[in-house]
Amino acid sequence: MHNDIIGYKYNDKIIDIQTAQEMGIENLEPIFFDNSSESLELIRHSAAHLMAQAIKELYPDAKFYVGPSIENGFYYDLKTEESITDKDLKNIEKKMKALAKKKIPIEKYYISMDEARKKFKDDELKQAVLDMINEDKVSIYKQGDFEDLCRGPHVPNTKYLQNVKLQKVAGAYLGGDSKNEMLTRIYGTAFATKEALQEYLKMLEEAKKRDHRKLGTELELWMFDEEIGAGMPIWLPKGTLLRGNLEKLLYSAHIRRNYLPVKGPELLRSHMWKISGHYYNYKENMYFTEIENDDPNKPAEEYGIKPMNCLSHVKIFGHKVRSYKELPLRFFEFGTVHRHEKSGVLHGLLRVREFTQDDAHIFCRDDQIEDEVIKVLEFVDAIMQRFGFEYEMEISTRPEKSIGSDEIWEKATNALKGALNRLNRNYGIDEGGGAFYGPKIDIKITDAIGRKWQCGTIQVDFNLPERFDINYIDENNTKKRPVMIHRAIIGSFERFIAILTEHYAGEYPTFIAPVKAIFVPINENHVNYAKEIQKELLNDDIITEIYDSSDSLNKRIRNAEKQKVGYVVIIGDEEVENDLVAIRDRKKREQYKLSKGEFVEMIKKLCEVKL
């Protein structure tokens, strides 16, 4: 079946075979039955319908809301009188595979909106779907006795859906609104081949071992406390050391690249957010409070807790007259921001409500944009190479909800493309994926087990300088509007540390590891020698630990190795008498001895990393 065509690409969109036939367009680019992203989108969307068909046969009272394909699979939101749990997934999956083997054709037909209302008159979930459709007719996809409202696209036959796996049952509010009823959401995945499915499931098992939430607890790096608040991470001592090492590395890297450190407040008057447009375009993601007015006769004034750092940087630029000779002017801030996320999407450090960005804003002339974006891209490359990440980039263009003229958007988008083209970098296009105030380059990294993560962004903004009326004086003594480039390379420290934790499975490289080595004295006679080495390293801000409890030697060694430090150092009589250390090297997976001086110099050198 790998040579079978299951759909087509038309104007960068995926359409199914029946839709292509209806359009009557020839020479379309075919989508073959394989594990390409386009093919998997078709397969997974259809697998969601196959799951719904199986559930309908097993639970005849089942009602379905929506069932899209998502990045790594699919889901369907539904409700049944009898609750469905993870234990039921095996039986549903068995039914799905039986239906797939029947090779049932998947067909589309159309009915009017009125007919659809009548057809689904007893199904409140379908009525909710119809409420979202502003068209005179709707499409329905049918396979056997099962049919559902859907825009498509779908594969032409269930025979293409034999490699499926249901993964978990969760809850989801109808339409994502917590005021509505809770539905059952079932997640699954599907591939074209059995081998690809097995490889993906194997990766998921490895991902469980690397889960940063699990490792963060085991290594005592960070915690969450519901009494403090969901999505608000608390950094424990070792986690703070880890984060501090990363911050120091990036801070010095910015200074060497002629960025100037700045710091803005956490609270800004809502007046500022109204000028910027965030108040009208981003308000649902912000937190607000009120502060009493200095004049007791006036009402309290509304303030917004910043969801991003850019406004203070704009004000810093505009607080005095700027000359063209100062440009480009690069400000950076490790700024803490707050953004409202629904509780259902919070996920460890990857998705939080409070986080700190490696934020920078570059103010430059129009003719400096490409050069500045190139410098940022080179900065990105230095960071990704240092941490061993492969990465890809994607330009996100103007979304439906946006501000600014077409001319400004085109100019900004072309500047990003120009920089990438000059560096001969491959990039994708995400149509409509830009922020409301400008196009951007998204940086997506690939970790050690092949997962892709969204991290940093580079964004050209002609809009905020206009809104805040900031200027510089050009060589002709004329006021000119600067261009503003927003950029965050790692995105946020929280998210990047989560990704690093899973990428390295908790075995951080020495230069950012919170604890560089653990000394295990064989008995109390060897503790002072360990303390001498520890003190010498501490003079260079290098943190180590000594495991000198009353536990057995083997237990202390095991406990030290569980901390995933690079070096467990055993100290006994021979080491003390000869100024040696016995090293268990985690990365090399070997044991060897060094002189005390050699060990100290080795650790110092490993920590002397620059970007």
Language-model regions, residue ranges each:
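NTP/phosphate- and nucleic-acid-binding module
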Residues: 1-65, 70-611
